[in-house]
């Protein structure tokens, strides 16, 4: 009988094949036993510098993995590969990763990033001793030189972490109100059952923006415990990922961006279905879910941030011939009145400068 892995390392791929093998090596070289690696390609057509597809790179990595772990007296690690037939966006890629994984815990690893040595051991030892839902490790942001040497930045604004423990509803509040931690799912060890619970509340959503915000909104709603640890577990590669600043030359690419509006539609729908009297005592153990006024204002502020970002990207990155259709699509997602209002604010601000 096959033993259930303790951890699933979940890796999404879209146009990141040049970095995939390096990413996989950082995963299978972990000094931890009883884990698996699950890779999902979101219909990616990319290739590495040697013309190899993600599927081919997985086969190479599996052979390397078998040899490395045998030589170092480590248990075998299976690398499983799944491929979407059509591009669905990060929310759905992570859904597939979660449903197809077998581990008790999940850690997300973006395919252009790397894990630090000993990352799985460090996070799991804390998970085992505390039983906490979310273990958040320290990440380092930086770039890689031509020899693949990592050059860290002095500051890391991508992986804000709260060092210490948070319990109950404060997990949500420390994130949404205090900004004590970032919503990224990478660099964290999270119970798989918590991911599945979160996805129960997220309908099929094609989106590449605000995906972490949507997922962590529900993860933090249902999480009972969080701990941030000093151990360095993750290397974040700056400005190369799935959603980096590339030219937008197709309406499908644009849809994956302006559909950030769907994130707030999902949350609004959930609130309508579950919201109770906001003045009700939060300490009652009746599984009541609702948001306080300051939390609602944070949500509205985040929505304003994303529509502002969408309009700026439309003006700066969408090719001219697609602009009329792109703006029409933006209005379909966000509402024409809202788009006009934000455009007016942007133009007014630019005139003042």
Model-assigned labels for residue ranges:
Residues 114-209, 214-218, 222-226, 239-252:
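Donor-binding/catalytic cores of nucleotide-activated saccharide
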Residues 106:
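Short aromatic/hydrophobic "clamp" motif used to bind/position activated sugar donors
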Residues 209, 232-353:
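C-terminal subregions of glycosyltransferases and related glycan-biosynthesis enzymes
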Residues 15-29:
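Short, well-formed alpha-helical segments that are part of the catalytic scaffolds
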Residues 5-8, 36, 214:
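Cell-envelope/extracellular polymer assembly enzymes that use nucleotide-activated donors
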Residues 26-83:
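Acidic donor-binding segment of Leloir-type glycosyltransferases
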Residues 83-101:
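Glycine-rich, basic loop-to-helix element that forms the pyrophosphate-binding segment
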Residues 88, 113-114:
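Acidic metal-phosphate-binding loop of nucleotide-sugar-dependent transferases
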């Amino acid at each position: 009988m096959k033993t259930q892995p303790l951890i699933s390392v979940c890796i999404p791929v879209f146009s990141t094949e040049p970095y995939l093998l390096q990413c996989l090596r950082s995963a299978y070289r972990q000094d931890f036993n009883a884990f698996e690696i699950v890779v999902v390609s979101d219909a990616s057509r990319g290739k590495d510098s040697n013309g190899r597809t993600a599927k081919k790179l997985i086969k190479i990595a599996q052979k390397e993995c078998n040899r490395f772990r045998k030589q170092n007296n480590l248990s075998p690690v299976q690398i499983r590969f799944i491929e979407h037939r059509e591009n669905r966006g990060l929310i759905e890629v992570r859904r597939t990763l979660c449903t197809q994984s077998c581990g008790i815990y999940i850690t997300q690893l973006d395919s252009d990033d790397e894990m630090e040595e000993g990352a799985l051991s460090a996070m799991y030892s804390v998970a085992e001793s505390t039983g906490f839902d979310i273990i958040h490790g320290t990440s380092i942001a930086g770039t890689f030189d031509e020899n693949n040497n990592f050059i860290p930045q002095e500051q890391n604004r991508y992986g804000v972490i709260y060092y210490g423990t948070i319990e109950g509803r404060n997990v949500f509040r420390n994130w949404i109100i205090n900004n004590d931690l970032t919503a990224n799912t990478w660099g964290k060890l999270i119970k798989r059952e918590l991911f599945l619970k979160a996805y129960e509340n997220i309908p099929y959503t094609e989106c590449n923006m605000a995906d972490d915000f949507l997922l962590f909104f529900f993860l933090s709603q249902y999480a009972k415990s969080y701990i941030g640890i000093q151990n360095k577990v993750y290397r974040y590669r700056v400005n190369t990922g799935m959603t980096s600043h590339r030219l937008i030359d197709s309406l499908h690419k644009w849809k994956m961006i302006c559909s950030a509006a769907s994130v707030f539609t999902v949350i609004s729908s959930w609130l309508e279905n579950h919201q109770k009297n906001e003045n009700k005592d939060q300490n009652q153990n009746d599984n009541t879910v609702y948001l306080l006024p300051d939390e609602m204002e944070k949500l509205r502020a985040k929505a304003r941030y994303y529509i502002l970002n969408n309009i700026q990207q439309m003006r700066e990155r969408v090719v001219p011939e697609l602009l009329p259709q792109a703006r029409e699509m933006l209005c379909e997602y966000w509402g024409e009145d809202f788009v006009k209002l934000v455009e007016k604010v942007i133009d007014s601000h630019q005139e003042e400068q």
